[in-house]
Amino acid sequence: MEKLTKRQQDILDFIKLKVQEKGYPPSVREIGQAVGLASSSTVHGHLSRLEEKGYIRRDPTKPRAIEILGDNRTETQSVIQVPIIGKVTAGLPITAVESVEDHFPLPASIVAGADQVFMLRISGDSMIEAGIFDGDLVVVRQQQSAYNGEIVVALTEDNEATVKRFYKEKDHFRLQPENSSLEPIILKQVSVIGKVIGVYRDLH
């Protein structure tokens, strides 16, 4: 392979480090901050040189899609770009926004079926005792049924979306918050649209 400049080597090493730490590559902004480049276009230029020299491969249709090639010592994981769908409440229900706001890279090993998984941003504190906080992103596997006690994204009779623990009882459904100061939502009809299988929280 063609020799790299010091800046290109620094960028490649940073990408490898982040893939090793998180299982997916860093953003252009993160790369720029790490190597002292304020301009995203300059970072893109260095990434293009790395690609031309055969060190990485990029998919222009997907954000953060950087694959490390050739003689590298970092075992990369396959990454899936999971859609982030609107906002859903973890307090009082709000209308679900069924549109893709963004995509988030997750290791394929924890996501079975990219077309059946999405993420939602939590608004509210009704699930805090389950470790789900305001502003968190929950990873949701699309499914139309759930076992009692599972945390689900559900649509109420008024087509409002909410994240709660699901219980099917004798003549009704109970959507139970994980906050001891809040009351459950009791409904005759409810539609499960997915099961929460993970939570992502940005600690920065």
From Swiss-Prot:
Annotation: DNA-binding region: 28-48
Keywords attached to this entry: Autocatalytic cleavage, DNA damage, DNA repair, DNA replication, DNA-binding, Hydrolase, Repressor, SOS response, Transcription, Transcription regulation
UniProt record, GO biological process: DNA repair; DNA replication; negative regulation of DNA-templated transcription; proteolysis; SOS response
Gene3D superfamilies: Umud Fragment, subunit A, Winged helix-like DNA-binding domain superfamily/Winged helix DNA-binding domain
Catalytic activity: Hydrolysis of Ala-|-Gly bond in repressor LexA
Pfam families, A to Z: LexA_DNA_bind, Peptidase_S24
An MF annotation (GO) of this entry: DNA binding
Top-rank EC class of the record's enzyme: hydrolase
Subunit structure comment from the entry: Homodimer.
Function as written in the Swiss-Prot or TrEMBL entry: Represses a number of genes involved in the response to DNA damage (SOS response), including recA and lexA. In the presence of single-stranded DNA, RecA interacts with LexA causing an autocatalytic cleavage which disrupts the DNA-binding part of LexA, leading to derepression of the SOS regulon and eventually DNA repair.
Family statement: Belongs to the peptidase S24 family.
NCBIfam families: lexA
Protein name: LexA repressor
Species this chain originates from: Bacillus mycoides (strain KBAB4) (Bacillus weihenstephanensis)
